[in-house]
A protein has these predicted regions:
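Extracytoplasmic ligand-binding site segments that recognize negatively charged/polar headgroups
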Residues: 57-71, 83-100, 104-238
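Immediate post-signal peptide segment of exported/extracytoplasmic ligand-binding proteins
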Residues: 23-57, 75-76, 178-184
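Short amphipathic alpha-helical coupling segments at ligand-binding clamshell hinges
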Residues: 70, 211-214, 282-294, 302-303
Length: 352
């Protein structure tokens, strides 16, 4: 059992306790009072309050270059200094939970994967927000409890080295990976159990389990930790064909002239990444202001400019023009142990 499994499995499910909504925000208002305020002077109050607070702390799993573009634009627009702590999604979750249980509240914004944000919701770490920009988002970006929202999609696709693999030779079905020509050429990320759940939902669990066992037995598969690393190994040619690459990262490298391109076998699996305001945020005005900024057309265009797949219906991108099946963060969390075990059985046990 991985450390991620032990941590997520140990989180207690919790009910959501609605906070009272006051008619106006106060100078020392709580996150609930700020986040749920919908008056006509909402933006003015957020900006004035954020400047008085003087700072913002973001915990994120986004790459530094990607988050840096958002943060830089926000700081320039509002004059609020932002502190960013970056780590893996599981570390973001673990730090947020550990600090909350110790009554140490330093996080204003959590910006990470959907399942981790859903875990924070269950731990009562996040605060529901009523933002005017929520109406612009695709339905799959919204949660019934409103405590986090999808800002972009991590779309799992396949990527290949264009010098090592010809486009006409690309597999069109998962069964095509049984061809001996793929022996020693396949790679996969170490912890993509939510991707596996999505694929199994498309082709059937019994059929998919048998098929992937045969693929690994016949042609092998290289298992690597981290999607950025896996994508870079495709570029270097060490892994000619990777099965679980985020299409935005492949597109970023392709635009820079790297020998990489991406495609989808069947329906691409999409998982929302998102943002949540901490329930005990020390800088609530700045937190809600950044939340609004990231899901506004301005923030979403910045994400699209980094080749992310934004969730706003007002921002177009060529990266979402493929059929997609969405991972439900709640289901991914509830069934995490099942799919992680199957993923390990299929790919990580006895593989390199």
């Amino acid at each position: 059992m991985s450390s991620k499994t032990r941590f997520i499995a140990g989180l207690a499910a919790a009910a959501v306790f609605p906070a009272a909504v006051l008619g106006q925000t106060k100078p020392n208002a709580t996150a609930a009072e700020v986040a749920l305020y919908e008056g006509p002077d909402r933006l003015q109050k957020l900006v004035e309050g954020a400047k008085k607070e003087g700072g913002l702390a973001i915990y994120t799993s986004a790459q530094s270059d990607d988050m840096g573009m958002l943060v830089g634009a926000f700081e320039k627009k509002y004059g609020v200094r932002v502190s960013v702590w970056r780590s893996s999604s599981e570390n973001v979750l673990q730090r947020a939970v550990t600090e909350a249980r110790a009554n140490r509240f330093t996080m204003d914004i959590a910006e990470t994967n959907g399942p981790e944000l859903e875990s924070m919701h269950r731990e009562k770490i996040l605060q529901a927000v009523k933002s005017p920009y929520l109406a612009d988002l695709i339905p799959q970006a919204l949660r019934p409890h409103g405590e986090w929202v999808g800002t972009r999609l991590n779309v799992f696709t396949q990527a290949y080295n264009t010098k090592a693999v010809r486009k006409e030779d690309l597999p069109k079905r998962w069964e095509d990976l049984l061809d001996p020509k793929w022996k020693g050429k396949l790679g996969i990320e170490q912890e993509d159990s939510d991707w596996l759940a999505g694929v199994m939902g498309e082709i059937g669990e019994a059929k998919g389990t048998k098929l992937f066992k045969e693929i690994v037995a016949k042609n092998g598969i290289s298992v690597r930790k981290g999607h950025t690393l896996l994508t870079q190994l495709v570029v270097s040619g060490e892994i000619p064909l990777a099965l679980t690459v985020y299409n935005y990262k492949a597109e970023q490298l392709k635009r820079k002239g790297a020998p990489i391109d991406w495609f989808a076998i069947g329906t691409a699996i999409a998982r929302p990444n998102g943002i949540g305001v901490a329930r005990r945020a020390p800088h609530p005005h700045a937190a809600v202001l950044f939340y609004d900024f990231e899901i506004s057309p301005e923030g979403q265009k910045i994400l699209a400019g980094r080749d992310f797949v934004p969730t706003s219906k007002k921002v177009d991108t060529p990266l979402n023009k493929i059929p997609m099946k969405f991972v439900d963060a709640r289901v991914a969390l509830d069934e995490f142990q099942k799919w992680e075990k199957l993923y390990a059985d299929l790919f990580t046990k006895g593989t390199k």
